[in-house]
Amino acid sequence: STKLVIDPVTRIEGHGKVTVHLDDNNNVVDAHLHVVEF
């Protein structure tokens, strides 16, 4: 499986990160948007 991380995500308030997990056929298994506001 593959893990794709986009960090930092811009144009939002706070600090954001996107994590996408792909299976062996490059299909999305799980995706998360993490936002931490200060």
Swiss-Prot record:
It comes from the Bacteria. Its main location: cytoplasm. Its EC number is 1.12.1.2. Its cofactor is FMN; Ni(2+). One of its GO terms (cellular component) is cytoplasm. It is found in: Cytoplasm. Keywords: Cytoplasm, Metal-binding, NAD, Nickel, Oxidoreductase, Plasmid. InterPro entries: NiFe-Hase_large. It catalyses: H2 + NAD(+) = NADH + H(+). It is an enzyme of class 1 (oxidoreductase). GO terms for molecular function: hydrogen dehydrogenase activity; metal ion binding. Belongs to the [NiFe]/[NiFeSe] hydrogenase large subunit family. Tetramer of an alpha and a gamma subunits (flavin-containing dimer), and a delta and a nickel-containing beta subunits (hydrogenase dimer). This is NAD-reducing hydrogenase HoxS subunit beta.
